[in-house]
Amino acid sequence: MMILRLALAIVISTYATAQPASTSSLVTYIFGDSLTEVGNNNFLQYSLARADFPYYGVDFSGGKATGRFTNGRTIGDIISTKLGILSPPPYLSLSQNDDAFLSGINYASGGAGILNETGIYFIQRLTFNDQINCFKKTKEVIRAKIGDGAANKHVNDAMYFIGLGSNDYVNNFLQPFMADGQQYTHDEFVELLTSTLHNQLTTIYKLGARKVIFHGLGPLGCIPSQRVKSKTRMCLNRVNEWVLEFNSRTKKLLIDLNKRLPGAKFSFADTYPAVLDLINNPTHYGFKIANTSCCNVDTSVGGLCLPNSKMCKNRQDFVFWDAFHPSDSANQILADHLFSSLLSSSSPSPAPKPRQ
């Protein structure tokens, strides 16, 4: 957890000292999947990975679906509030005249993965490579606005949050109809993932990113969509072991990149222990149910909370909103944990705190 505290320390210190071209606020660029999406897929006409319908957003400001895959806020939304900045808007919602290019953008897309083939059955989504290309275009817009030198400094000073890899398992390797799960052993697959990620992170570095936080995977074997595969509805230990191997390999990758790339400050945020403790001990944090979701979903047809799904009455009792995504209340606990880890940096990282 020391790596997590280092990552968050970089965030706060950057927020306090960085001076981007047009604002003294922290500038953040976010890459990810449905855990951090804020509405990019709303603009993809044929995407099947969308959350722009009820009951998504029922607890968000205004009570309407925004494209966030939860009943309320993402962890990114909550952290942005704690940092005193607005949650960055979705890239596909912007025109080149928008000031958001200078204040932060969210490129995350539901269904996205590290590998291009991940989530292909969603028809449209922004893969990690697509998101990197969007960032490349963003830099071109910034350069046109403020000039080459200022643009380079701007992207060097910004913070980059990356959270990908979950779909490479849940919507690729673990799916019997996807080729990767049939073609590769897990050792081969995790090597493919991390070698691809190596190239992608190197590309982002060449585009100017220096302060990068990569969010490791949580215990995917314990999410509702995986538990239903067990006769006892218990966590799938094999899946969790694979996740831990991916996390370990990714940590080593980031350490290697920091050694080889001048000025790189790539950090790994290990949230696996905190999420697992929340799932294993829900009552300690004010929850009642962690083995199924608030929205009664059909995991055989995607596991999303559709308008005809049955929603639970007490949403605050559930760790999970749908078959894949945490509830607003769980996201609050996990976001609080990230900050409490930083504040207690002189001592071992504490477990998440219960709701007040």
From Swiss-Prot:
Organism: Arabidopsis thaliana
Protein name listed in UniProt: GDSL esterase/lipase At5g37690
Presence of keyword Transferase: no
Cleaved signal peptide residues: 1-18
Glycosylation site positions: 116, 291
EC number of the protein: 3.1.1.-
InterPro entries: GDSL, GDSL_esterase/lipase, SGNH_hydro_sf, SGNH_plant_lipase-like
Cross-referenced Pfam families: Lipase_GDSL
Entry similarity comment: Belongs to the 'GDSL' lipolytic enzyme family.
Gene Ontology MF: a single term: hydrolase activity, acting on ester bonds
GO BP term, example: lipid catabolic process
Active-site residue list: 34, 322, 325
Gene Ontology terms: cellular component: extracellular region
Domain of life according to the entry: Eukaryota
Subcellular location as annotated: Secreted
Keywords, in A-Z order: Glycoprotein, Hydrolase, Lipid degradation, Lipid metabolism, Secreted, Signal
Uppermost EC category: hydrolase
Keyword Iron-sulfur: no
